[in-house]
UniProtKB/Swiss-Prot annotation:
Family as reported in the entry's similarity comment: Belongs to the zinc-containing alcohol dehydrogenase family. Quinone oxidoreductase subfamily.
MF GO annotations: oxidoreductase activity; zinc ion binding
Source species of the chain: Staphylococcus epidermidis (strain ATCC 12228 / FDA PCI 1200)
Keywords: Metal-binding, Oxidoreductase, Zinc
Annotated protein name in UniProt: Zinc-type alcohol dehydrogenase-like protein SE_1777
Length: 336
């Protein structure tokens, strides 16, 4: 089988260092599924991991995938051969930038039947990140009526995570405020369901006042935590909660959180599979809920760009686009 990877970390300005490798098709055992990959999504985490030291050569990146189960391990109980599934994988194994992939069943769910593979591939990583942030971190209710009156600010509402998080939060009853700046990103965020879209290039505090927003219960930062840290502390309500998926690049003063008793959390969606937590089955459960909501028409996919064919050039192009920070929604590569 073909896989696209690299032997050592590299920056894009060093040239295209992706290479094509050929491996034997693996055999599933235990709770493993052998999936023939149809479509993958490229995420910012891929571009970050490309620049990190390589422990095992070659390094094959990729998390989001949609594909067909070709074989199952002898302990698999939730799936059968021929099922079309989607997932976001685990940092503990080779990624989805390959024709066949082994994946454990508790990280997988059946893909929405009303979506093409290139549409469904946009949902797992960002959807899981949003579900974990909203339900596990913020602790919102799964009963929409119980979230009435609660508000959420999403920094970078038109990105992949912000796009699906907006839809999920709206379905579960939150008032959603997002940030964007370009005409196309503002329109996109509104289409995703945002109640208010603020211009991140202007003073957010003043825009809160202009829109009669006294503060928000939750803030979900999906872009440059350092840039927004003090502003988020100012905008969150007392005893509110801030979560980020972007690591700090410099030291920040946690004492700023004290006077409001604000909770600050780093959300890392891969913590469960990385550390084999007892509740790792939540990935399956959350993905299953995403599938149900998509099939019922409540969520829509966030794919905005599709590249046909997985090879060294298409993957390099995808990484270039991601690093330009101009993407709205998600970028997908079809293997078919």
């Amino acid at each position: 089988m073909k896989a696209i990877g690299f032997k050592s970390s590299f920056q894009l300005d060093e040239g295209n260092c992706f290479e094509e490798f050929n491996f034997d098709i693996p055999h599933p055992s235990g709770h493993e599924l052998l999936v023939k990959v149809q479509s993958i999504s490229v995420n910012p985490v891929d571009t970050k991991q490309r620049t990190m030291p390589v422990d095992k050569v070659p390094r094959v990146l990729g998390f989001d995938a949609v594909g067909v189960i070709e074989k199952i391990g002898d302990q698999v109980s939730m799936f059968q051969e021929g099922d079309v599934v989607f997932y976001s994988g685990s940092p503990n194994q080779n990624g989805s930038n390959e024709e066949y992939q082994l994946i454990e069943e508790y990280l997988v769910a059946k893909a929405p039947t009303n979506l093409k593979s290139e549409q469904a591939a946009s949902l797992p990583l960002t959807g899981l990140t949003a579900y974990e942030t909203l339900f596990d971190v913020f602790g919102i209710s799964k009963e929409p009526s119980e979230n009435k009156g609660k508000s959420l600010l999403i920094i970078n509402g038109a990105g992949g995570v912000g796009s699906i998080a907006t839809q999920i939060a709206k379905f579960y009853g939150l008032k959603v405020i997002t940030t964007a700046s370009r005409e196309d990103t503002i329109k996109w965020s509104v289409n995703m369901g945002a109640d208010v879209v603020l211009n991140h290039k202007k003073d957010l505090s003043q825009q809160f006042k202009d829109n009669h927003i006294e503060g928000v219960d939750y803030i979900f930062c999906t872009f440059d935590t350092d840039m927004y840290y003090e502003m988020m502390v100012n905008l969150v309500k007392p005893r509110g909660h801030i979560a980020t998926i972007v690591a700090f690049n410099s030291q920040q003063d946690l004492n700023l959180l004290k006077s409001k008793s604000v909770t600050f959390t780093h959300e890392f969606m891969f913590s469960r599979p990385l550390h084999h937590t007892d509740d790792v089955i939540k990935h399956h459960e959350y993905l299953k809920d995403i599938t149900e909501k998509v099939e019922q028409g409540y969520y829509q996919p966030t794919t905005t760009k599709v590249i046909d064919g997985l090879d060294v050039d298409s993957l390099y192009e995808a990484h270039q686009i991601l690093e330009s920070h101009s993407m709205i929604g998600k970028l997908v590569i079809n293997l078919k």
